[in-house]
Amino acid sequence: MNQVLSERIKNLPASATLAMAAKARELKNEGKDIIGLSLGEPDFNTPDFIKEAAIDAIDSDYNSYTPVDGYLELKEAICEKFKRDNGLNFAPNQIVVSTGAKQSIANAVQVLINPGDDVLLVAPYWVSYSAIVILAEGNPIEIRSDIETDFKITPSQLEAAITPKTKLVMLNSPNNPSGSVYLSLIHISEPTRPSS
């Protein structure tokens, strides 16, 4: 058996983000003045209070496996933050802590999508979305937006894209990469509501 990687992985397209980052590095190494817009790397150092908290955790032997959905104290703090800053009320059992957005999105898609299900992606979208859907054996279906609509889709576009195979709509606000913000999702979500 010579094949190590699965066909599923081998058939994924290469990451556009990693390809752009490699090209930017190459040009920078050639002495060109490059502003890298590919990877979302912070342009600031980790704040001291976070570094100190990490050191304190290590010194206190706070180093065992965490609960799968996150520490209760952290989930309670997240609930408090949502209430204080956003006026949203959640219970700790409604919060899942993960290593980042990509993991959370991949987990959600894996548990929601069956082979052959359609997932609607509002384009432009984060480059990982289509690969995440393909890994779940779903079909990524693009709904295009443009500068004239501030890179937002309309309810009629969404309604036209929905078919009996549609299982999920992936829409993020603020959008990555366009930055557009849906101030209200009520009007855009109307086509997804069950008819009475």
Show the residue positions of the predicted features.
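Secondary-structure boundary/capping motif
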Residues: 16, 46, 150, 178-182
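Short conserved AdoMet
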Residues: 29, 59, 113-114, 163, ...
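PLP-dependent aminotransferase-like
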Residues: 92-93, 110-171, 181-185
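Single conserved hydrophobic/aromatic residue that forms the stacking wall/gate
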Residues: 186-196
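Short N-terminal helix/helix-N-cap motif within the alpha/beta-hydrolase-1
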Residues: 100-106, 123-124, 179
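N-terminal small-domain helix-loop-helix segment of the aminotransferase-like
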Residues: 2-100, 107
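Glycine/Thr-rich phosphate-binding loops of Rossmann-like dinucleotide-binding domains
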Residues: 45, 105, 129, 178-179
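Flexible low-complexity scaffold tracts in large eukaryotic assembly proteins
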Residues: 173-176
